[in-house]
């Protein structure tokens, strides 16, 4: 069971220092993939192992999970993976993150908290203001991948991203993964659970234009 954390809590107003790319990674020149809401980070650990030609950054709002993930990175001496604790909206909207955002080539939102009650929609990670921040900072060609097993949440995320002029939908059938990064080659724990239980998965790809 996922532990729900209120991202609007004042506890997340203070942002930890974001290291430079050279501090986070062995080779700061590699393309950078960002996973928002990375949980324990197993998805990124697997990606970092499968595709070593990229750097990976995970943002997670549960501090204990981030501490454990950082310890694993240290123990395994992984040079292309880093984790940051906090609210992604606050972190990426902070001035110290601007340079990092401009180096991001793709972002994934995998099975984010649905926050089913309407009064809690404002707690969802994808908000119009957040998408505006991304549209203003991301380079052209940057990809966004969303994936969920909750149809209502998918529709909400799709409307929110699609309403921003700077992002266009890409038909998955026409998307050439050989020419771009493919985070879908690795499945999250939630996705494996959904597949085993034959639950529908809703996903979409967007590009910054």
Curated annotation (Swiss-Prot):
Active-site feature positions: 113
Organism for this UniProt entry: Prochlorococcus marinus (strain MIT 9215)
Name used for this protein in its record: tRNA (guanine-N(7)-)-methyltransferase
Pfam families linked to this entry: Methyltransf_4 (PF02390)
Family: Belongs to the class I-like SAM-binding methyltransferase superfamily. TrmB family.
GO cellular component terms, semicolon-separated: tRNA methyltransferase complex
GO MF terms held by the record: tRNA (guanine(46)-N7)-methyltransferase activity
Amino-acid positions noted as binding substrate in the UniProt annotation, renumbered to this chain: 117, 149
Domain of life of the source: Bacteria
Binding site for S-adenosyl-L-methionine: 35, 60, 87, 113
This enzyme's EC code(s): 2.1.1.33
Pathway stated in the Swiss-Prot or TrEMBL entry: tRNA modification; N(7)-methylguanine-tRNA biosynthesis
Catalyzed reactions: guanosine(46) in tRNA + S-adenosyl-L-methionine = N(7)-methylguanosine(46) in tRNA + S-adenosyl-L-homocysteine
Keyword Repeat: no
Entry-linked InterPro entries: SAM-dependent_MTases_sf, tRNA_(Gua-N-7)_MeTrfase_Trmb, tRNA_methyltr_TrmB_bact
Signal peptide feature range: none
Role summary: Catalyzes the formation of N(7)-methylguanine at position 46 (m7G46) in tRNA.
This protein's UniProt keywords: Methyltransferase, S-adenosyl-L-methionine, Transferase, tRNA processing
């Amino acid at each position: 069971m996922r532990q729900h954390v209120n991202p609007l809590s004042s506890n997340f107003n203070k942002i930890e220092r974001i290291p430079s790319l050279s501090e986070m990674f062995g080779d700061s020149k590699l393309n950078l993939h960002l996973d928002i809401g990375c949980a324990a980070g197993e998805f990124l650990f697997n990606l970092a192992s499968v595709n070593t030609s990229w750097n990976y950054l995970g943002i997670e709002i549960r501090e204990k999970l981030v501490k454990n993930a950082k310890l694993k990175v240290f123990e395994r001496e992984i040079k292309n993976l880093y984790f940051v604790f906090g609210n992604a909206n606050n972190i990426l909207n902070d001035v110290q993150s601007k340079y990092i955002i401009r180096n991001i080539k793709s972002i994934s939102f995998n099975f984010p908290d649905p926050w089913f009650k309407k009064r809690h929609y404002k707690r969802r990670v994808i908000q119009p203001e957040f998408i505006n921040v991304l549209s203003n900072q991301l380079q052209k060609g940057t990809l966004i991948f969303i994936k969920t097993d909750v149809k209502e949440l998918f529709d909400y995320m799709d409307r929110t991203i699609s309403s921003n002029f700077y992002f266009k939908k890409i038909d998955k059938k026409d998307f050439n993964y050989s020419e771009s990064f493919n985070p879908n080659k690795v499945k999250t724990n939630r996705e494996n659970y959904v597949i085993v239980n034959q639950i529908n998965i809703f996903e979409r790809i967007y590009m910054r234009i």
